[in-house]
Amino acid sequence: MTGRYSRQELFAPIGPSGQKKLKEARAVIIGAGALGTASAEMLVRAGVGSVKIADRDYVEWSNLQRQQLYTEDDVKKEMPKAAAAERRLRSINSDVDVTGLVMDVTAENIFELIRDASIIVDAADNFETRLIVNDAAVKEGIPFLYGACVGSYGLTFTVVPGSTPCLHCLLDALPIGGATCDTAGIISPAVLQVAVFQVTDALKLLTGEECEPVLRSFDLWKNERSEVRAASLKHDACPSCGTKDFPFLSYENQTKAAVLCGRNTVQIRSSITKEADLEALAGQLRQAGLEVAANPYLISCRSDDMKMVLFRDGRALIHGTNDIARAKSIYHKWIG
């Protein structure tokens, strides 16, 4: 066998019939950073028929250490990640319908984005977006493959609506906020390990196999790994998959962002962060090399031409831009 997918078809759990199912499948990837590009490349090489990848950001020098689809030329041209990823993925496999979407994923546009999707792969850079996607996935009955990593640590769980707990059910078991890749760093093996778990489950689901409801976590540097059988964590009263209220699709539970008139500043009020631990956050930001000032009411930090002021109630001012998408990107890089 010398065909493009011959070695994959020789793998008995997939075979020629599974390969046909992959060709008919549609994957949507939320985020085109490290996780998104790794998962996208594997899915495209595997022959998944349609791959959409959505991201609001552009390629920077600090991305090249772990975001495998991008080049120095993309940085110099300030290419949007989704556009650069689309071009590269099309060059890898012209048989796949690849669409890169330069957009901020919100409750307002999520249903158009995931229309007709077979699976949704999480590669978002913040937890609020994940909860929006989780609610939409549960509502539409589309499997959602959660994944996150920072430092040498990673975490994955596959949500199968109607069968497994959803992400909302697992909130008490998941780390929300805190360290980010921009404050604690990241090594590429951790990214790839998470993507491996996500794409393996994606291939299983797309070829008709079931996935176990297992919450997987690991720390590669410490050579630690754990698995939690998560079926018992499903809550009948969960507002997302239980009572089907889908709270994160409502306006009241979304991050509010507004451009402040005449100030080149965006105000952001997170729906998740109710009260910030300013002291702990100041320490993280200083460790990341940012210039930080603090008083009992707020902290401020600078990086290049951008300044962020964070108040104890979780409200933030991003100075140096009037672009809401850019301000959100900076906020989630520094705050999580």
Curated annotation (Swiss-Prot):
This protein's species is Bacillus subtilis (strain 168)
Which residues participate in Zn(2+) binding? C166, C169, C238, C241
Q: Which Pfam families match?
A: ThiF (PF00899)
Q: Which residues form the active site?
A: C181 (glycyl persulfide ester intermediate)
> Function of this protein?
Catalyzes the adenylation by ATP of the carboxyl group of the C-terminal glycine of sulfur carrier protein ThiS.
Instruction: From the UniProt record, list the reaction(s) this protein catalyses.
Output: [ThiS sulfur-carrier protein]-C-terminal Gly-Gly + ATP + H(+) = [ThiS sulfur-carrier protein]-C-terminal Gly-Gly-AMP + diphosphate
Entry protein name: Sulfur carrier protein ThiS adenylyltransferase
The GO molecular function terms of this record are: ATP binding; metal ion binding; nucleotidyltransferase activity; sulfotransferase activity; thiosulfate-cyanide sulfurtransferase activity; ubiquitin-like modifier activating enzyme activity
Q: Which PANTHER family match?
A: ADENYLYLTRANSFERASE AND SULFURTRANSFERASE MOCS3, UBIQUITIN-ACTIVATING ENZYME E1
Q: Which InterPro entries match?
A: ThiF/MoeB/HesA, ThiF_NAD_FAD-bd, Ubiquitin-activating_enz
Which residues take part in binding ATP?
A: R7, A34, D55, R66, K81, V105, D125, N126, F127, E128, T129
Q: Report the sequence similarity comment from the record.
A: Belongs to the HesA/MoeB/ThiF family.
Q: Which GO terms describe its cellular component?
A: cytoplasm; cytosol
Q: Under which pathway is this protein filed? A: Cofactor biosynthesis; thiamine diphosphate biosynthesis
Q: How is the cofactor bound?
A: Binds 1 zinc ion per subunit.
Q: Which cofactor does it need?
A: Zn(2+)
